[in-house]
A protein has these predicted regions:
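Peripheral (non-transmembrane) domains and long loops of multi-pass membrane proteins
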Residues: 195-230
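Core subunits and conserved enzymes of cellular information-processing
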Residues: 1-209
Length: 230
């Protein structure tokens, strides 16, 4: 039990660092807004020049209080730790180390930023915490429904994309943001569920092959190939 809990905290801290790298090294320098708290903080940072980490902390205060009430003290504690780690890592990289953008090419920045953030969020979820913002709302919804976490986040991120388009006065940057968010949601699923797999099933039958093929297609939507053997 102790070993598992230590591993959970390692997931949370490492995920927080990856998320911070995605924001500071790829997205924020290129005015590309990711989703959730990080994306909203990037937008607000360009409206009022407070450090992104501070904005993230301010946005998450009411949501953390909600998590205490509805999601339990342990989850809330881990979420507070995660939010603090992200805020510290973001401002450490941006304000103290002065980390420069790894790429000014929008395609590379969007994809690698999305990969860093998606992997980071996946690790944070795997550790039993939330990065705050949309992820807390997603946790509330997914705990009561069968909707996937990534789907909820994708919907909520749309609001951030619209806000980014208005603030940055660029539809193109909003479109890049959508690509980054899509990449991050796919990485969340890969970390939590694993990479998608495909299987081949061989069915041997002496008769009724066409009927069997039709039944498989009608029930599963999967086509097949009939091979005659001797």
């Amino acid at each position: 039990m102790l070993r598992k809990e230590i591993l959970n905290y390692l997931f949370i801290v490492s995920g927080s660092f990856l998320l911070a790298v995605g924001v500071v090294a790829f997205l924020s320098p290129n005015n590309i807004a990711t989703g959730g708290t990080a994306g909203l903080a990037i937008v607000l940072h360009h409206v009022i020049d407070l450090p992104i980490g501070i904005w993230m902390g301010l946005i998450n205060v009411p949501l953390v209080l909600i998590s205490f009430k509805y999601l339990g003290k342990q989850f809330a504690f881990k979420t507070i730790l995660c939010i603090l780690c992200i805020a510290i890592f973001v401002d450490l990289l941006a304000e103290v180390i002065k980390l420069q953008a790894f790429s000014k090419e929008l395609l590379l920045a969007t994809l690698y930023g999305g990969i860093c953030i998606g992997t980071g969020l996946g690790l944070i979820f795997k550790g039993g915490a939330s990065a705050g913002g949309a992820t807390i709302i997603a946790r509330l919804i997914t705990s009561r429904t069968s909707i996937k976490t990534s789907t909820v986040i994708l919907i909520l991120d749309g609001i951030v994309i619209v806000s980014a388009g208005i603030v940055f006065k660029s539809i193109e940057l909003s479109l890049w943001s959508m690509i980054g968010i899509y990449a991050s949601t796919k990485l969340i699923d890969v970390v939590l569920i694993g990479a998608p797999t495909q299987k081949i099933v061989h069915i041997s039958s002496l008769k009724n092959l066409n009927e069997l093929s039709k039944m498989v297609f009608d029930n599963m939507g999967i086509s097949g190939t009939i091979v005659k053997g001797e």
